[in-house]
Structure formats: C-alpha cells, structure tokens
C-alpha cells in the first residue's frame, strides 16, 4: 500500500486551511535582515515585510538542507513510502536541486521532485492537483505521469509596482533592458520554459497593464474552461477589483482570491503586485 507525501515550499502561496486539511509538507524560505533571520510565513508576515521596506529591504535564502533532511526523517518515521515534491522554479531558486539531493539520499522513500518552473499559485495549483489525485486513490506512478501534462495547462501573469525590487534581488530575468522607466512602460511578467521571468508584453501605465492581463485571460478562456487564482503583493484594493472582473470571464469554472503572496515573494517583487493564474481544466 502506497503512502504518498506531498512536499512544497512557502512560495506556492497555499492557504493554511488547505495545508492542514491535506497534510502538505511546506518548506520555509528564509528572510534575512541585518540583525535577524526569519522563517517565511512562520515568524514573519507579508505585511511586516512591506511595512519595513523603507527601513531595510531584506535578503532571502532557500530552505536549509537541514530542514529538508529533517523533513525526510519525519516522513520515514511516519511510514511514508513515496514523496512528490513540487518546488519553486529552478530559474529563481536552488530549492529544486537541494531537495532532489536530499531525496536521493533517502532511498527508503521513492521520490519524484518536480521543478514547477513557476512561482506562487502556479506552483500551488500543481500541488492542489497532486493532492486531489492522492485523494482519488491514484498511484504514485499515475501522479508522476500526470504532473508534466498539468503543468502545460497552467498560465501565470503578473504586474508589479516597480521593477526595482526584482533588480535588487537578482530576479529580473529577461525583463531587463526592455522597459523605459521614464515612459511609464509596464511589463506583463510571466515565466518562460526555463522558469525565468520575462516580459510577455509591455504597455504604458498601470491601468492599461491590468487591462492587458484581462485581455490575455480572455484569449485563454475563450476556448478552454479554466480555474482562476488571483493574488497580490500589498495591492489589496486593486486585486479585489481585478478579481471581480476575472470571475465574470467566460469559461471560468472556479475563481479563488488567495490574498497576499508569501513574505519572501514580496521581498523580490515589492509592493504593487497583482497576479493571475489560470489552470485549463
């Protein structure tokens, strides 16, 4: 009898309720200030990160290898035979390589560690689908086979208030050099096949950038029924207005407002993020 564990990280932006109900194992990123280090979503909130920006923009690091080692020991003690890990994009972090290395050292548990090439609820949607398959008594091999196919159906787009934070954190990817700050050009950011940020499109002005994301969503939902997720980074009012419009799109089966992104994601994106994830169903 297979006993399958799911492992992910705090950037997947899953709700606490979902994590508890589905026994999801979540590895915490680290947020590092000059005088103190915090565990993402454990002892620091997104709001605290944003409010402190004027004083200090912190650095971040991936979950420690020791945290991963401790998790695998716990899973072994709890009698898990298999583990599926869904991680933040390897184009943005070393967590995929780290978790794969630790998984390979624990041969008692058969593991499949998957590089989502996504962030936030793009990654989170994959975790949710894996959890559903476990509840539907799918085998480990069936789930492993399904994951890359589900990944192909996930679309992620977001806009940010300023690119300065992505630059500071070294997460600017392929967006650099394409944006004219003085012209108020706003990129619609997505991730490419390597899981690196790039400018999917560029428009002038904040309002137009959100309208453009809506147009992109209309194109995707025109021919496919989709599940939608909306999230924000210190842009609650705008994101709620955006969510109302998303719910009215044709072919939206379910729409979820997941609130604020993880503190560590906020460190790199800065205030003003509004994001949309679509999963073709």
From Swiss-Prot:
Record key words, sorted: Lipid-binding
Gene3D superfamilies recorded: 3.30.1180.10, 3.40.50.10170
Function as written in the Swiss-Prot or TrEMBL entry: May bind long-chain fatty acids, such as palmitate, and may play a role in lipid transport or fatty acid metabolism.
Positions bound to hexadecanoate: 60, 93
Entries under SUPFAM superfamilies matching the protein: DAK1/DegV-like (SSF82549)
GO molecular function, one term: lipid binding
InterPro entries: DegV, DegV_C, DegV_domain_contain
Full protein name: DegV domain-containing protein CA_C0948
DegV domain ranges (all copies): 4-280
């Amino acid at each position: 009898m297979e006993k399958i564990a799911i492992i992910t990280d705090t950037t997947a932006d899953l709700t606490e309720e979902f994590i508890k109900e589905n026994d999801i194992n979540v590895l915490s990123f680290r947020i590092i200030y000059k005088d103190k280090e915090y565990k993402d979503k454990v002892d620091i909130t997104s709001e605290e990160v944003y409010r402190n920006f004027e004083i200090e923009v912190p650095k971040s690091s991936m979950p420690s290898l020791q945290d991963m080692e401790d998790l695998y020991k716990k899973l072994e003690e709890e009698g898990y035979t298999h583990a599926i890990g869904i991680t933040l994009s390897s184009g943005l972090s070393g967590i995929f390589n780290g978790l794969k290395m630790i998984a390979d050292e624990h041969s008692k548990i058969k593991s499949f560690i998957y590089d989502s090439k996504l962030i936030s609820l793009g990654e989170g949607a994959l975790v949710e689908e894996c959890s559903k398959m476990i509840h539907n008594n799918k085998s480990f091999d069936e789930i492993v086979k399904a994951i890359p196919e589900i990944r192909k159906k996930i679309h992620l787009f977001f806009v940010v208030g300023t690119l300065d934070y992505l630059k500071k954190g070294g997460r600017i990817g392929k967006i650099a050099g394409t944006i004219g700050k003085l012209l108020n050009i706003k990129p619609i950011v997505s991730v490419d096949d390597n899981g690196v940020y790039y400018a999917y499109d560029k428009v002038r002005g904040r309002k137009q950038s959100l309208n453009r994301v809506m147009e992109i969503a209309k194109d995707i939902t025109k021919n496919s029924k989709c599940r939608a997720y909306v999230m924000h980074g210190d842009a609650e009012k705008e994101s709620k207005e955006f969510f109302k419009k998303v719910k009215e799109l044709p072919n939206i089966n379910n729409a979820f407002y997941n609130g604020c992104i993880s503190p560590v994601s906020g460190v790199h994106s800065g205030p003003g993020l509004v994001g949309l994830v679509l999963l073709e169903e």
